[in-house]
C-alpha cells in the first residue's frame, strides 16, 4: 500500500508545485464551503469514531480530541479561508546579487516536495495539514490514528471530490487507511517517496518515529510546559494564568503540566491556587516534599512526574529557593515546547527568557498561546520542539526549502 500511495503523492507533487497562487487560494475557499455543506456527513462518520472510543473506555478528555461538532467544522472552514488569505511563500525571492564573476545569483523559496504526516486522534489535523501543504505546493501522505479513521476518511474523500471538480490531480493528498504499526513503519522508511516526515502526537509516537524513520523527521508536539511563579509575582495574576494553562483545555500540547514556585511565596500561593483551581475543575497535585506541606491535598511526586505530559487534570509541583534553581529544574525536565515565568522583576524575566531552552518562552502569560494562529502564521502543521529547519509553530514557511538560481554568460572557473 505504501508503494502505491507513495508513488501517487510523489508524482502529484510535480503538479502541486506548478499551481498558481490564485488556483490554490480559489480551491481552499471552495473546500471551506464544501466542509460546511457536508457538516452532517462529517458528523455522522465522526460519531462512529466516538462510539468506538467510548466502547474502549477512553477518557472524556481524549474523546473530546476526537469530537467534531458543527462549530468545530465551521472553525476548520475558517482556518482554510485564513490560509487562502495568507501570502504565498512559493517563489519569494530571499536574496539576489551579482558576484565578482558576473554571475547573477538568486535564492528563492520552493516546495519541500512530498510531506508525510503521522498523527493521532485529532481529525482537524487532516484539514490543517492538507491546507498548509497544498498552499505551499507540496503533496501530502497522511496517516492518522485508528481512533479517528472514519473521520479522516470522510475528510479526505471531501478533499478529493473537490480536487477532481477543480481538475487538480487528487494524488496531492492520500490517506494511509491501514493504521497498523507495520504499515506505519513502512511509511517511516519510504524515503524514495517522502522528502520529510512530521509526527504529531504523544511522546511514544514521536520517539517511535525518530527511532524507525529513514525519512528526515521534524519533531513536533510533546508539551511538558511549566510555569514558574517568582517571589515578586502578582499572586492573583499567577493564579489566573495557572488555572487557564492547566484547565482551559488540558488535552493539548500547550497546556501546563508542571508548576515551579519560589519558596518565599509557596505557603501563600499554593493554598490559594489549589482553592481557586478546584472551583473550575478538581486537579490532582503531584508535589515535592516542600510543596506538599503547603497543599491541603496532594500526592508525592516522582522524578518521572516532572517530565510527564499528563494531558489530564494533573499538575506536578516543585518548590525552589531561587531563579537559577527554577531554570535548572525546567531545563532538566522540559520538552522544549513552552515555558512561562510570572514575575514583576524585569531582570528575572529577561534572565528566564535568555536561559530557558524552549521554542516559546513567556513572561506573565499563559502557555496556551503557543499556536500558529496566535503567532500570525495561520494554521499550523505542528509545533516543532527541535532546532533544525523549524522551531515553534510551523506555518507555511516551515514547509518550504530554498533553491539557488544562477544566470551566467559563459563564465568558467
From Swiss-Prot:
From the UniProt record, list the reaction(s) this protein catalyses: L-glutamate 5-semialdehyde + phosphate + NADP(+) = L-glutamyl 5-phosphate + NADPH + H(+)
GO MF annotation list: glutamate-5-semialdehyde dehydrogenase activity; NADP binding
Q: In which pathway does it act?
A: Amino-acid biosynthesis; L-proline biosynthesis; L-glutamate 5-semialdehyde from L-glutamate: step 2/2
Provide the protein name.
Gamma-glutamyl phosphate reductase
Keywords in alphabetical order, please. Amino-acid biosynthesis, Cytoplasm, NADP, Oxidoreductase, Proline biosynthesis
Which family is this protein grouped under? Belongs to the gamma-glutamyl phosphate reductase family.
Gene3D superfamilies assigned:
Aldehyde Dehydrogenase, Chain A, domain 1, Aldehyde Dehydrogenase, Chain A, domain 2
- Enzyme Commission code: 1.2.1.41
The UniProt entry, under HAMAP family, shows: ProA
Q: Which gene encodes it?
A: proA
GO biological process per UniProt: L-proline biosynthetic process
Q: Entry's NCBIfam families?
A: PRK00197.1, proA
Would the keyword NADP turn up in this protein's UniProt record?
yes
Q: Give me the disulphide-bonded residues.
A: none
**What organism is listed for this UniProt entry?**
Lactococcus lactis subsp. cremoris (strain MG1363)
Known function: Catalyzes the NADPH-dependent reduction of L-glutamate 5-phosphate into L-glutamate 5-semialdehyde and phosphate. The product spontaneously undergoes cyclization to form 1-pyrroline-5-carboxylate.
Amino acid at each position: 500500500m505504501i508503494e502505491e500511495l507513495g508513488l501517487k503523492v510523489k508524482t502529484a507533487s510535480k503538479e502541486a508545485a506548478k499551481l498558481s497562487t490564485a488556483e490554490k487560494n480559489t480551491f481552499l475557499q471552495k473546500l471551506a464551503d464544501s466542509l460546511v455543506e457536508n457538516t452532517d456527513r462529517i458528523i455522522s462518520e465522526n460519531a462512529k469514531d466516538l462510539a468506538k472510543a467510548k466502547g474502549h473506555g477512553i477518557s472524556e478528555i481524549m474523546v473530546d480530541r476526537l469530537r467534531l461538532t458543527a462549530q468545530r467544522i465551521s472553525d476548520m472552514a475558517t482556518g482554510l479561508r485564513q490560509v487562502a488569505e495568507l501570502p504565498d511563500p512559493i517563489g519569494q525571492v530571499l536574496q539576489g546579487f551579482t558576484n565578482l564573476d558576473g554571475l547573477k545569483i538568486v535564492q528563492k523559496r520552493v516546495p519541500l516536495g512530498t510531506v508525510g504526516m503521522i498523527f493521532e486522534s485529532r481529525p482537524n489535523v487532516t484539514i490543517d495539514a492538507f491546507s498548509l501543504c497544498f498552499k505551499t505546493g507540496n503533496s501530502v501522505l497522511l496517516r492518522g490514528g485508528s481512533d479517528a479513521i472514519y473521520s479522516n476518511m470522510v475528510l479526505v474523500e471531501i478533499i478529493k471530490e473537490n480536487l477532481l471538480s477543480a481538475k487538480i490531480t487528487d494524488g496531492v493528498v492520500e490517506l494511509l487507511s491501514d493504521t497498523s504499526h507495520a504499515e506505519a513503519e513502512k511509511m517511516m522508511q519510504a524515503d524514495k517517496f517522502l522528502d520529510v516526515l512530521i509526527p504529531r502526537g504523544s511522546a511514544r509516537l514521536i520517539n517511535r518515529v525518530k527511532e524507525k524513520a529513514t525519512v528526515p523527521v521534524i519533531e513536533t508536539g510533546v508539551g511538558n510546559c511549566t510555569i514558574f511563579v517568582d517571589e515578586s509575582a502578582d499572586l492573583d495574576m499567577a493564579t489566573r494564568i495557572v488555572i487557564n494553562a492547566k484547565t482551559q483545555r488540558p488535552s493539548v500540547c500547550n497546556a501546563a503540566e508542571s508548576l515551579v514556585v519560589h519558596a518565599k511565596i509557596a505557603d501563600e500561593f499554593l493554598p490559594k491556587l489549589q482553592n481557586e483551581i478546584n472551583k473550575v475543575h478538581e486537579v490532582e497535585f503531584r508535589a515535592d516534599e516542600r510543596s506538599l506541606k503547603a497543599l491541603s491535598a496532594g500526592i508525592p511526586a516522582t522524578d518521572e512526574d516532572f517530565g510527564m505530559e499528563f494531558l489530564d487534570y494533573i499538575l506536578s509541583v516543585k518548590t525552589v529557593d531561587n531563579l537559577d534553581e527554577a531554570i535548572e529544574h525546567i531545563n532538566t525536565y522540559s520538552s522544549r515546547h513552552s515555558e512561562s515565568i510570572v514575575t514583576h522583576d524585569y531582570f528575572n524575566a529577561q534572565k528566564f527568557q535568555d536561559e530557558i531552552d524552549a521554542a516559546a518562552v513567556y513572561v506573565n502569560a499563559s502557555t496556551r498561546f503557543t499556536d500558529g494562529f496566535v503567532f500570525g502564521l495561520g494554521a499550523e502543521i505542528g509545533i516543532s520542539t527541535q532546532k533544525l529547519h523549524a522551531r515553534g509553530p510551523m506555518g507555511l514557511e516551515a514547509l518550504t526549502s530554498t533553491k539557488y538560481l544562477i544566470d551566467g554568460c559563459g563564465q568558467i572557473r
